Amino acid sequence: MQTEHVILLNAQGVPTGTLEKYAAHTADTRLHLAFSSWLFNAKGQLLVTRRALSKKAWPGVWTNSVCGHPQLGESNEDAVIRRCRYELGVEITPPESIYPDFRYRATDPSGIVENEVCPVFAARTTSALQINDDEVMDYQWCDLADVLHGIDATPWAFSPWMVMQATNREARKRLSAFTQLK
């Protein structure tokens, strides 16, 4: 895969430039654009993934299905599709926005900061997973209710962005709609 960049943003969320992704994530990470996606299978189960130990930020942490950064000129939806193919080896339904104005800042135990405007999406797949070990070290298909209960009971066991997304009432409601079989 070619070198990825992040789209830098000012405080109002307006693009101001780009920076190589690996260089962008430091102890003083500048605000940038990202996305987060929750993927459901034909049984209405959520894919929860564990980040590879080689990841710069939050290695080995359990999180929602896929996260990433849209590239210059790429829509958020196309970025979700691209990363689902790259990380999970799956085709997905068109991503649906579930939390369009999500923004967060969090620091991992090593001091690496995430500072993102991060629209959240959900999608479905019927494809068999073909996991990219450079991105994902483990995964589990779970009932959403069980995951939400786990987040409520032990938020420290999940990525901070997953916890913040899952505790938003409207996002939780929209995620629940994806558990209904179609």
From Swiss-Prot:
GO BP: dimethylallyl diphosphate biosynthetic process; DNA damage response; isoprenoid biosynthetic process
Cofactor note (record): Binds 1 Mg(2+) ion per subunit. The magnesium ion binds only when substrate is bound.
Residues of the site described as Essential for catalytic activity: 104
Keywords from the UniProt entry: Cytoplasm, Isomerase, Isoprene biosynthesis, Magnesium, Manganese, Metal-binding
Documented EC number(s): 5.3.3.2
Pathway membership, UniProt: Isoprenoid biosynthesis; dimethylallyl diphosphate biosynthesis; dimethylallyl diphosphate from isopentenyl diphosphate: step 1/1
Residues the record lists as binding Mg(2+): 67, 87
Localization terms from the record: Cytoplasm
Active-site residue list: 67, 116
Annotated binding of substrate, by residue: 21, 51, 55, 69, 83, 87
Coiled coil location: none
Residues in Nudix hydrolase domain copies: 30-164
Pfam families: NUDIX
GO cellular-component term (any): cytoplasm
GO MF: isopentenyl-diphosphate delta-isomerase activity; magnesium ion binding; zinc ion binding
SUPFAM superfamilies named among the record's database cross-references: Nudix
Residues reported to bind Mn(2+): 25, 32, 69, 114, 116
Major localization listed first in the record, in broad terms: cytoplasm
Keyword Cytoplasm: yes
Catalytic activities: isopentenyl diphosphate = dimethylallyl diphosphate
Family note: Belongs to the IPP isomerase type 1 family.
Cited function: Catalyzes the 1,3-allylic rearrangement of the homoallylic substrate isopentenyl (IPP) to its highly electrophilic allylic isomer, dimethylallyl diphosphate (DMAPP).
Complex and partners: Homodimer.
Protein name, as recorded: Isopentenyl-diphosphate Delta-isomerase
Naturally occurring in which organism (per UniProt): Escherichia coli (strain K12)
